[in-house]
């Protein structure tokens, strides 16, 4: 398993903004800028890159068909990429042992791992539920290059 410590350290310097790339049906890349963070995968307990995506997002459709993603974070000229299998957990992508309450808490955990804070968690929870938001968890198979100081 690839180490995510350098990735986590690097992305914190840029508000946890990263580019996530998925693969369209025609084989071309689809990329989005998102907030992401490193946290333990709720099903495996191993470190993963997590992000939250609205239910209608193209990246979710791509990941359902081709569950692999690349995430790249940068700070100045330093950058780190993470590649790996992606798992979706959400109202349209159920997972064993993750009920509605566990999903609510997982989405919060990803948001806070990505540096987010909120003054009204009830509103946050309601908005994500209304948007049918899903957790995207990328288990690292490869990281490159090592961030340099």
Where does each model-flagged region fall?
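A generic short-segment signal for beta-strand/edge and adjacent turn/coil regions
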Residues: 1-7, 36-41, 48-57, 102-110
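Short, basic/aromatic recognition patches
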Residues: 1-19
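Charged, gly/pro-rich active-site loop segments
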Residues: 2, 78-149
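Generic marker of residues within folded, mature protein domains
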Residues: 10, 26, 74-76, 126-128
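Alpha-helix boundary recognition
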Residues: 11-13, 64-65, 129
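Alpha-helix boundary/capping residues
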Residues: 14, 66-67, 110, 114
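Short beta-strand segments
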Residues: 15-55, 61-63, 69-73, 81-85
């Amino acid at each position: 398993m690839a180490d995510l410590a350098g990735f986590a350290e690097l992305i914190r310097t840029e508000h946890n903004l990263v580019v996530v790339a998925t693969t369209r049906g025609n084989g071309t890349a689809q990329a989005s800028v998102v907030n992401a963070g490193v946290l333990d995968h709720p099903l495996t307990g191993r470190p993963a890159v997590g992000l939250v995506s609205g239910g209608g997002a193209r990246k979710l459709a791509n990941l359902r068909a081709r569950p692999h993603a690349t995430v790249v974070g940068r700070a100045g000229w330093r950058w780190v990429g993470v590649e790996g299998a992606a798992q979706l957990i959400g109202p349209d992508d159920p997972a064993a042992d993750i009920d509605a309450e566990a999903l609510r808490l997982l989405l919060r955990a990803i948001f806070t791992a990505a540096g987010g804070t909120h003054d009204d968690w009830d509103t946050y929870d309601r908005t994500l539920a209304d948007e049918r938001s899903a957790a995207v968890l990328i288990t690292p198979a490869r990281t490159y290059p090592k961030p340099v100081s």
